[in-house]
């Protein structure tokens, strides 16, 4: 007869032994930043045999840029002036769905792209030619207000909550040591053979050779729209215009090329000119914030969207 309990203990001991050997023998890697780039890097490195620790400054992974977005998986429709970007999008989607397919939302969401009748950098004719040249599928749709062309396309969104769960599960599955509420300093590097910095807007804080970037403080309003917009994602192009995407079950998140930006600067670090807005940054959805550009979003949306 087989002693299952004894075999189970042997298996557990073997796993613990492997983990102990891994910690002593394999190179130690520190990944700083718990967004999608950091968690993916940590998982892949641990999978490759490295002994990986991930530091996240906040109390959970995926709370900053990875979770404050339009949640759209771009297939390239958004980039008619860059075929290279389209190809990068198509390749990126394949990789994303291989790694995080369970977070992708298909459902009954309808995706639309529209070319504005004014101030668009691309004409309707050129946009259609671009789609045909790149092999991007589309169906012509009745143009929405203020547009010369509206098409329906086959795109997808991702659920940020599901992505967070899946990222955590993957890291746990390959033995990544996740340390939350950890402010990382250069002194922490001494304990590791390699360091991966994946802190997005804070890249330069831990680097000696700093690079200049353009930083933007951006607002993404979360709103409840009329029922006619339920399960609809709309992007107005190609200029300083509006977009809206479903968020959770009955809400939408808004974007605007111009009005979403509260401040911008080029330099080594981001500069938040309005100090009163600091408490809003990377702090989830804030109900009725005192500082907001929502009225400008509404005015811009009324040009294209009925009952907005």
Show the residue positions of the predicted features:
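Helical element adjacent to the flavin cofactor pocket in flavoenzyme catalytic cores
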Residues: 151-184, 194, 198-204
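Dinucleotide-binding Rossmann-like beta1-alpha1 core, especially the glycine-rich loop
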Residues: 70-146
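Flavin-binding catalytic cores
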Residues: 267-308
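N-terminal Rossmann-like FAD-binding beta1-loop-alpha1 element of flavoenzymes
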Residues: 28-53
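Short beta-strand to alpha-helix junction loop
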Residues: 80, 115-124, 149-169, 288-293
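Glycine-rich FAD pyrophosphate-binding loop
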Residues: 47-66
């Amino acid at each position: 007869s087989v002693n299952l309990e004894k075999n189970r203990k042997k298996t557990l001991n073997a796993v613990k032994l492997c983990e102990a050997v891994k910690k002593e023998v394999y190179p130690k890697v520190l990944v700083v930043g718990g967004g999608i780039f950091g968690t993916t890097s940590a998982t892949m490195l641990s999978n490759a045999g490295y002994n990986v620790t991930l530091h996240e400054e906040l109390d959970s992974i995926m709370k900053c840029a990875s979770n404050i977005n339009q949640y759209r998986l771009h297939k390239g429709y958004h980039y008619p002036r860059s075929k290279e970007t389209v190809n990068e999008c198509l390749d990126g989607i394949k990789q994303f769905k291989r790694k995080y397919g369970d977070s992708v939302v298909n459902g009954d969401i309808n995706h639309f792209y529209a070319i504005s009748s004014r101030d668009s950098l691309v004409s309707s004719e050129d946009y259609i030619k671009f789609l045909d040249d790149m092999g991007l599928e589309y169906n012509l749709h009745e143009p929405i207000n203020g547009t010369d062309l509206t098409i329906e396309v086959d795109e997808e969104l991702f659920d940020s909550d599901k992505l967070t769960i899946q990222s955590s599960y993957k890291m746990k599955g390959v033995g990544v040591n996740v340390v939350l509420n950890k402010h990382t300093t250069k002194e922490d590097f001494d304990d590791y053979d390699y360091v991966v910095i994946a802190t997005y807007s804070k890249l330069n804080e831990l680097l000696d050779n700093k690079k200049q970037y353009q930083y933007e403080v951006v607002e993404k309003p979360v709103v409840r729209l009329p029922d006619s917009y339920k399960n609809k994602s709309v992007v107005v192009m190609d200029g300083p215009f509006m977009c809206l995407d479903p968020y959770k079950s009955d809400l939408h998140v808004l974007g605007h090329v111009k009005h979403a930006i509260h401040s911008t600067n080029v330099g080594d670090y981001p500069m938040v000119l309005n100090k009163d807005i600091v408490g809003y940054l990377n702090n989830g959805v804030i109900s009725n914030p005192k500082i907001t550009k929502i009225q400008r979003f509404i005015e811009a949306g009324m040009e294209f969207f009925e009952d907005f």
